[in-house]
């Protein structure tokens, strides 16, 4: 496996804490229980049109797995897992079906991209959803302090443009935060300490991959 090869793993966001770096400065970190995952399928350009590995994470009661999924896991020779995801890469020769993928694959990697599902906030107003300043608190403003205000013209254009930022469902979106620094790797406990915040609530599923922008290595 080359140094610049894309690597990825599934994990669970445990929460945030803080640690000290080499210069005794406090660094806020997010703790991710990364893996262990298992390779359940290998996709190749010849048969599938692209190269990728399929990894599975999290134990699941075999009685709650449908027959197609049961057969898929049985073919791979692994017990049923709760989550399955694909990690695309140029070369899959370093992997084989049934192989375990642990957090130590990120040894030597400095920066990662983390994908997760953001917290759902339900129906939210424009001030909360988009950070609008709102309207004046006095001077004739009548029960419109948190309203959007004007959303377009009258006879022209005679409609509201697509993408106009207004009130609506907020959160519960799949979001990727890029170029986050790996502060520490605890291989024994399968823990990954990532500097800063990552998307999602505690206990949520996240995908951690080597950074695609700016270089994964310092």
From Swiss-Prot:
GO molecular function: rRNA binding; structural constituent of ribosome
Keywords: Ribonucleoprotein, Ribosomal protein, RNA-binding, rRNA-binding
Pfam families in UniProt: Ribosomal_L3
Biological processes, Gene Ontology terms: translation
Entry annotated with the keyword ATP-binding: no
One Gene Ontology cellular component annotation held by this UniProt entry: cytosolic large ribosomal subunit
Purpose of the protein: One of the primary rRNA binding proteins, it binds directly near the 3'-end of the 23S rRNA, where it nucleates assembly of the 50S subunit.
Cited PANTHER family: 50S RIBOSOMAL PROTEIN L3, LARGE RIBOSOMAL SUBUNIT PROTEIN UL3C
Quaternary data: Part of the 50S ribosomal subunit. Forms a cluster with proteins L14 and L19.
UniProt family annotation: Belongs to the universal ribosomal protein uL3 family.
Protein name (database record): Large ribosomal subunit protein uL3
The gene coding this protein: rplC
